């Protein structure tokens, strides 16, 4: 898969003192280096064997990833995020609460998947609230496209999952079509369509606020055959 159009724009946003501390003082304790010469060995990187590894692409400020890692210490979590404020925020939380089952990489997710993730090595991939690029002329920037899902499928082991969530209905329809068209996957909802929010996905403050305003959220969970 050739990466041509990026699904994100890097903006120079404000970084708080705590986020900067996360980047300066503790990032090295959690970061997987993209420029390492070979694909990552998760048993080595996490310091344990036989633990499931789940990737979250675009973890934002890390709220969901942090909660899931805390609630599931038996699993490894790898978070991919390009925005420094979010990386610093998550790392500061991981340090404060001494969470040891999370690693982060601050790099383009497509390039990470192409070069650093071994095939059939993941128990699942979660993509929560990706940028919807709601203007039609920008739809080509949306992360979730057929070619991208085909690459994800190779990295996930049989019975592993892809879990997406979005609060944009037309993006939800697009994601449903893309995932349903991939022959290596089946919809966890046997009757098709969207899934109820799994208990494993924490509700964020953003999502709770949206619910109060009557905004919908669509979850999609597909399993590799």
From Swiss-Prot:
Gene Ontology MF: a single term: tRNA (guanine(46)-N7)-methyltransferase activity
Residue numbers binding S-adenosyl-L-methionine: 56, 81, 108, 131
Keyword terms of this UniProt record: Methyltransferase, S-adenosyl-L-methionine, Transferase, tRNA processing
Any GO CC annotation of this UniProt entry: tRNA methyltransferase complex
Record-listed substrate binding positions: 135, 167, 204-207
Highest taxon, organism lineage: Bacteria
Protein's pathway: tRNA modification; N(7)-methylguanine-tRNA biosynthesis
EC number: 2.1.1.33
Known catalytic reactions: guanosine(46) in tRNA + S-adenosyl-L-methionine = N(7)-methylguanosine(46) in tRNA + S-adenosyl-L-homocysteine
Gene3D superfamilies registered for this protein in UniProt: Vaccinia Virus protein VP39 (3.40.50.150)
Pfam families in UniProt: Methyltransf_4
Enzyme category, top tier: transferase
Enzyme active site: 131
Annotated PANTHER family: 3-DEOXY-D-MANNO-OCTULOSONIC-ACID TRANSFERASE/TRNA GUANINE-N 7 - -METHYLTRANSFERASE (PTHR23417), PENTACOTRIPEPTIDE-REPEAT REGION OF PRORP DOMAIN-CONTAINING PROTEIN (PTHR23417:SF14)
Family statement: Belongs to the class I-like SAM-binding methyltransferase superfamily. TrmB family.
Biological role: Catalyzes the formation of N(7)-methylguanine at position 46 (m7G46) in tRNA.
Protein name per UniProt: tRNA (guanine-N(7)-)-methyltransferase
Classification of source organism: Bacteria, Pseudomonadati, Pseudomonadota, Gammaproteobacteria, Legionellales
């Amino acid at each position: 898969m050739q990466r041509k159009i990026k699904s994100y724009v890097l903006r120079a946003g404000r970084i708080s003192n705590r986020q900067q501390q996360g980047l300066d003082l503790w990032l090295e304790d959690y970061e997987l280096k993209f420029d390492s010469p070979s694909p990552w060995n998760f048993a080595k990187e996490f310091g344990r064997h036989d633990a499931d590894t789940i990737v979250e692409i675009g973890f934002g400020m890390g709220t969901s990833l942090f909660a899931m890692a805390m609630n599931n210490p038996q699993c490894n979590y790898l978070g991919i995020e390009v925005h420094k404020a979010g990386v610093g925020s998550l790392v500061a939380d991981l340090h404060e609460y001494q969470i040891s089952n999370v690693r982060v990489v601050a790099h383009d997710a497509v390039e990470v998947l192409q070069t650093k993730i071994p095939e059939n090595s993941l128990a699942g991939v979660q993509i929560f609230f990706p940028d919807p690029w709601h203007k039609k002329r920008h739809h080509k920037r949306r992360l979730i496209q057929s070619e991208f899902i085909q690459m994800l499928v190779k990295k996930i082991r049989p019975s592993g999952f892809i879990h997406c969530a979005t609060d944009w209905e037309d993006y939800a329809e697009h994601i449903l079509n893309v995932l349903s068209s991939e022959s290596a996957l089946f919809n966890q909802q046997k009757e098709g369509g969207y899934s109820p929010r799994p208990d494993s996905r924490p509700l964020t403050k953003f999502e709770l606020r949206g619910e109060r305003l009557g905004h919908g959220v669509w979850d999609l969970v597909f399993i590799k055959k």
